[in-house]
């Protein structure tokens, strides 16, 4: 094993392995970042100062788009009084559903109180007195753990009325969704939270102006909010000492697939896949890297030529993809790229809400063409049809679900067109899917 140039920086994940790490007692035993100390510090500051700290830290959204968190908070109208004043809301998007994305669920399971503390600080900053954590309904253990942690926070006086004697009140609700991937899109999430079918809204108006119940609303990802307490305690300079100039700080990288030690690796933004694979023991023994996703199934594929691309928003963007949720799905040479993209296409076809014609119809036809290619009934024209349909989807719907379906299609043809041609000219898939399978303990099937 070589020496890693970029050290891991466990901050959010530092105490995940502690016994009963999810309890309030354990959270408050931490040495450097003792639980709820950041909240106590924030409550002594004016709300606008808290926003300024988060803005100056350079924290960017960890849910995919990478928008500046402090800037998003500052969009909330401040100073409204009288009849014109509307309540402000904070919503945490914990509807983690995309293939390959798996960082928020272990975070909430291991240390739910860091999320709750971040929620209280963020709500105080934007002057919200009601906050919601919207969780994917299937993850029942996460829901139970969050409910227990919220109950502990209420009992300790960190939630409810007059928190810490500051005069600030906050009610926090943990809400279970019904399992629709589309509800990970922020405006569809708001519709679901209001009791309607989850579908993306036309913007403008943006949630900061007309969000939940038509009121100013901030929507942030779990990891984004969980990063706030350490910034309040550690300070701007400490946070900016990690990562890159435009993408400062630390983040969770999720390695899965054909890797020796899959899991969550917390590191500064800008680390490379080569370095992360070094920490993870490399690609599984006897195999080599073929392609990978930098941010889950909705981001354009990269290849072994991109091992040294800095994994920050600018570096990955310059390489032709997106950092997204930092879900690094690793595929070795035994994987059929056509089969992999077909599986993702089936997912997006199933999860399309049907509101926008390009996405609804486009994902259906993409799936039909992939079925032909995999079963030996494809043609050379089908490859061009995939690109044509993807172009008809890209950027032509209310949300980015259709874009996510088109991205792996277009990028896989760009990098592996010969493999598509082999499916046409060879009468079907030339790969044996058993070669790429893994059993539960990571040993070849």
UniProtKB/Swiss-Prot annotation:
FMN binds at residues 177-224. NDH-1 shuttles electrons from NADH, via FMN and iron-sulfur (Fe-S) centers, to quinones in the respiratory chain. The immediate electron acceptor for the enzyme in this species is believed to be menaquinone. Couples the redox reaction to proton translocation (for every two electrons transferred, four hydrogen ions are translocated across the cytoplasmic membrane), and thus conserves the redox energy in a proton gradient. It comes from the Bacteria. It catalyses: a quinone + NADH + 5 H(+)(in) = a quinol + NAD(+) + 4 H(+)(out). It is an enzyme of class 7 (translocase). The keyword Iron-sulfur applies. Binds 1 FMN. Binds 1 [4Fe-4S] cluster. It comes from Mycobacterium tuberculosis (strain ATCC 25618 / H37Rv). SMART domains: NADH_4Fe-4S. Transmembrane segments: none annotated. GO terms for biological process: cellular respiration. GO terms for cellular component: respiratory chain complex I. [4Fe-4S] cluster binds at residues 353, 356, 359, 399. This is NADH-quinone oxidoreductase subunit F. Belongs to the complex I 51 kDa subunit family. Its cofactor is FMN; [4Fe-4S] cluster. PROSITE patterns: COMPLEX1_51K_1, COMPLEX1_51K_2.
